[in-house]
Amino acid sequence: MMATYEGRYTDAQALRIAVVVARFNDLVTGKLLSGCLDCLARHGVDTSSNSDQLDVAWVPGAFELPIVTQTLALSGQYEVVITLGAVIRGDTPHFDVVVAEASKGIASVSRETGVPVIFGVLTTDTMQQALERAGIKSNLGWSYGLQALEMGSLMGVLRSATSAS
């Protein structure tokens, strides 16, 4: 019989979540974090300053996201890690290097640790595009929060199903 596995957006109180935020372009990343925390709170995650369920780590920029994400994922304390950043194209190839290394690094953390890592790094050509994605038109931080809830739940379902068989 075919099995179907899906994550849920309920029972979020059971998840331990880490959010790693790049400080560079904090006008954008601060808004992403706000949207993400709003989503998590509305789904039952304790986002208060004395929360035992959520931790937020700030890093200098998107390039530093993978190492801190890996450290948190390896700690065994979190069911899911969310990364938030904003890399905006400039006149030099720096954008391409940062985006490539950050995305590869973040993806490898998830594969190597088995902890879902949500890729919440905006890659845009202009600051205006980044701001539109961080709150002017919509806030993708909310979407990243939902992805974290779904993946954290799904991994729990999969672990239970595979350990039972």
Curated annotation (Swiss-Prot):
One of its GO terms (molecular function) is 6,7-dimethyl-8-ribityllumazine synthase activity. It catalyses: (2S)-2-hydroxy-3-oxobutyl phosphate + 5-amino-6-(D-ribitylamino)uracil = 6,7-dimethyl-8-(1-D-ribityl)lumazine + phosphate + 2 H2O + H(+). GO terms for cellular component: cytosol; riboflavin synthase complex. Keywords: Riboflavin biosynthesis, Transferase. The active site is at H94 (proton donor). 5-amino-6-(D-ribitylamino)uracil binds at F24, A62, F63, E64, A86, V87, I88, F119. (2S)-2-hydroxy-3-oxobutyl phosphate binds at D91, T92, R133. Its EC number is 2.5.1.78. GO terms for biological process: riboflavin biosynthetic process. The keyword Transferase applies. Pathway: Cofactor biosynthesis; riboflavin biosynthesis; riboflavin from 2-hydroxy-3-oxobutyl phosphate and 5-amino-6-(D-ribitylamino)uracil: step 1/2. InterPro entries: LS (IPR034964), LS/RS (IPR002180), LS/RS_sf (IPR036467). CDD domains: Lumazine_synthase-I. It is an enzyme of class 2 (transferase). SUPFAM superfamilies: Lumazine synthase. NCBIfam families: lumazine-synth. Catalyzes the formation of 6,7-dimethyl-8-ribityllumazine by condensation of 5-amino-6-(D-ribitylamino)uracil with 3,4-dihydroxy-2-butanone 4-phosphate. This is the penultimate step in the biosynthesis of riboflavin. Belongs to the DMRL synthase family. This is 6,7-dimethyl-8-ribityllumazine synthase.
